[in-house]
């Protein structure tokens, strides 16, 4: 999967602001591009989705009745008509670029015109609390397989196969990594700062977790202690079980952080303990919204019940999220490359769009 960083020139952000403003925790911006061919059912479909942290903020779908870059959250609606016109035009240009690219790569891989194929690109940046780049990303995939990725040093590429090495040589000759690095260290972070400022009421909020511990007997000799954290934002959180003050990381069952359906998150960590020794175990909770870490124990007199409704709601949202990702990205898994030689690519000229430049696929 690939991400390409936004490259629009920011006129409203001063250098002084960039150097003095700080943000709690780290933040990220990602763009996901997906092009899907569909023989016999019209032109290939092209979709762009943009995220700041976990929040989708823009969307473009070439299948729309009147394709335009569309807002997906209130704070991005602050951008004026010029922003939306520019972003729409770039997405329309990318639509044609990816359609040509699909045909080009199909030929390189010696694939028939009957099959459906995908090109995906993911790009973006992570920003630290000091407002500077933590890490940049730019990756490309074809038919569900990694193709070419910008390395963490932002100056070299990793090719997945011999076909991708052809592209790598072309991009190295075009000094594409230098262009990507300039964007990721500059405009990508600048736009992310701008979006964080415009959406600070939601993007920079810190909702502390609601926490409790539940007890679940397994047998006469063992029980499960489950440490719950509910209703928190942002998603980053640490739950650690300790026995007599020593971490029990190896023995802890930890689920992935889940959306709760109300723009907050849920998570739990569980440990199996000998019956009668429950009070030797504590759960340590660390989150940006807490003034200091919490230490929890199971309280037998106030046995908590599992919040089934909340968990089901969270899982329902997770299913919806997966469905959206399936439209945008998971089609990668639908087909696997049939082999052959890889496509040839060249880096497109930089633009001053919030989306940044995109890859150009050439014959």
Swiss-Prot record:
Residues 344-363 have a biased composition (Low complexity). InterPro entries: Ig-like_dom, Ig-like_dom_sf, Ig-like_fold, Ig/MHC_CS, Ig_C1-set, MHC_class-I_related, MHC_I-like_Ag-recog, MHC_I-like_Ag-recog_sf. Residues 299-308 are annotated as: Connecting peptide. Keywords: Disulfide bond, Glycoprotein, Immunity, Membrane, MHC I, Signal, Transmembrane, Transmembrane helix. It is a single-pass type I membrane protein. Gene3D superfamilies: Immunoglobulins, MHC class I-like antigen recognition-like. One of its GO terms (biological process) is immune response. Residues 1-24 form the signal peptide. Residues 334-363 are cytoplasmic. It is found in: Membrane. CDD domains: IgC1_MHC_Ia_HLA-B (cd21026). This is Class I histocompatibility antigen, Gogo-B*0201 alpha chain. It comes from Gorilla gorilla gorilla.
């Amino acid at each position: 999967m690939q991400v390409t960083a936004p490259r629009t020139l920011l006129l409203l952000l001063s250098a002084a602001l960039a150097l003095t403003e700080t943000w709690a925790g780290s933040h990220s911006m990602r763009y996901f591009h997906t092009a899907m061919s569909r023989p016999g059912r019209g032109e290939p479909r092209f979709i762009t989705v943009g995220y700041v942290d976990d929040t989708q903020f823009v969307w473009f779908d070439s299948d729309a009745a009147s394709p335009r870059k569309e807002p997906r959250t209130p704070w991005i609606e602050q951008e004026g008509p010029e922003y939306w016109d520019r972003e729409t035009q770039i997405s329309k240009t990318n639509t044609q670029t990816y359609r040509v690219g699909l045909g080009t790569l199909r030929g390189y891989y010696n694939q028939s015109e009957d099959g459906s194929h995908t090109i995906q690109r993911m790009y973006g940046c992570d920003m630290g609390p000091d407002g500077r780049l933590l890490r940049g990303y730019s990756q490309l995939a074809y038919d569900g397989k990694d193709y070419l990725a910008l390395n963490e040093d932002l100056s070299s590429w990793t090719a997945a196969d011999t076909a991708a090495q052809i592209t790598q040589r072309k991009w190295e000759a075009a000094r594409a990594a230098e262009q990507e690095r300039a964007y990721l260290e500059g405009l990508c972070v600048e736009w992310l700062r701008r979006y964080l400022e415009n959406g600070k009421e939601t993007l920079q909020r810190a909702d502390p977790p609601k926490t409790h511990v539940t007890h679940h007997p397994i047998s006469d000799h063992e029980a499960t202690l489950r440490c719950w954290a509910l209703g928190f934002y942002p998603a980053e959180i640490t739950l650690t079980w300790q026995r007599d003050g020593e971490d029990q990381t190896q023995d802890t069952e930890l689920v992935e952080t889940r959306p709760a359906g109300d723009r907050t998150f849920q998570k739990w960590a569980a440990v199996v303990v000998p019956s009668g020794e429950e009070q030797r175990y504590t759960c340590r909770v660390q989150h940006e919204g807490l003034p200091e870490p919490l230490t929890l124990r199971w309280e037998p007199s106030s046995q908590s019940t599992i919040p089934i409704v909340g968990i089901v709601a969270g899982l329902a949202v997770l299913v919806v999220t997966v469905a959206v990702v399936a439209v945008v990205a998971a089609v990668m898994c639908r087909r696997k490359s049939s082999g052959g030689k890889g496509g040839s690519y060249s880096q497109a000229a930089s633009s001053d769009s919030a989306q940044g430049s995109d890859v150009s696929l050439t014959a």
